[in-house]
Amino acid sequence: MSKTFQPSIVMLTIFLILVTSQRRKCDEKIVLQFCNGRNRCYEYCDTKECVAACKKKRNGEGICNGDVFSVSAQCLCLYKC
């Protein structure tokens, strides 16, 4: 394996552990938010019930600032609906 590939596996493993360990009722569900570098974010909710709540932040309002957890302050953040 290349040296750049291995750390990404570690990060993915850590992320999966964090998401699965923090599953709660819907109003506290974790939202995964990827920023594209221009303060626009792509959000992924883990339940259908949370999708509507998350769409409210999708239109450029969301900026990754590490409110709940961040691997990088500008790239990958976890938010709550």
Swiss-Prot record:
Residues 1-21 form the signal peptide. It comes from Arabidopsis thaliana. InterPro entries: DEFL. Belongs to the DEFL family. One of its GO terms (biological process) is defense response to fungus. It is found in: Secreted. Keywords: Antimicrobial, Disulfide bond, Fungicide, Plant defense, Secreted, Signal. This is Putative defensin-like protein 135. It comes from the Eukaryota. Coiled coil: none annotated. GO terms for cellular component: extracellular region. Disulfide bonds join 35-81, 45-64, 50-75, 54-77. It holds the Pfam family SLR1-BP.
